[in-house]
Amino acid sequence: MELLTKPEGAFVVDLGCGNGMLTKKLAEKGYHVLGVDDSETMLRLAEKNCSGISFQKGNAVDFSLKQKADAIFSNAVLHWIDAKDQQKMLDNICHQLVLGGEFVCEFGGYGCAEQVHSMLEKCFAAHGMTYPRVFYFPTIGTYAPMLEQAGFRVEYASLFDRPTVQEGRDGLADWISMFVKTPFLGMDDSLKKEIIWETIEKLRDTLWQEDHW
């Protein structure tokens, strides 16, 4: 959020606003803010959390604005978009900005949660199944040219480690259940639990730290 350079009063879109907590912080910085999310459930929660802020339903790939934005901000969203749709999404984001507009985003990059995904891949294989890599975690070298192709000038990009603590014995299992849904679609619940248990047991020696993952 600190990377935004537009002055107070600028029209800023929070793309993939979720529960609206960051949308609210953008408004507190003096911006005229619009939150956009594809989940009606999240939008209802955002409207409850943020009085006086406007929200609209829209997918990152094809959302449209009545008024072009001075800046578009996005946090922890873009890695959820399929690889095949990434360029289309970036083209659309650029199109929704005024000339000289800013796009500031944070999302999972190359190597994100790789130990977990690699172990899930091995455990799926042990059961005769393929673990689909559904998240998009690019390198800067891959993504910067895509941004430029969309019409952006890349001024700053950084790939950095950011450990996310999962509290308690079941923290990692809960994280997998919450965020890694697609690979388990249609799977018997008992098999799903077995694979998750196998995964966390194999990761225990490297990721478990006394009372958290």
Regions found by a protein language model. Name each.
Residues 1-10:
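Conserved alpha-helix/loop element of class I SAM-dependent methyltransferases that forms part
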Residues 24-27, 90-94, 117, 121:
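A structural alpha-helix within SAM-dependent methyltransferase catalytic domains
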Residues 64-72:
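A short acidic, Gly/Pro-enriched loop at the edge of an enzyme's catalytic core
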Residues 87-102:
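A short glycine-rich, Lys/Arg-flanked "PGG" loop and its adjoining helix->strand segment in the class I
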Residues 100-169, 185:
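Conserved catalytic/acceptor-binding region of the Class I
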Residues 155-211:
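C-terminal helical/coil "lid" or tail adjacent to the Rossmann-like core of SAM-dependent
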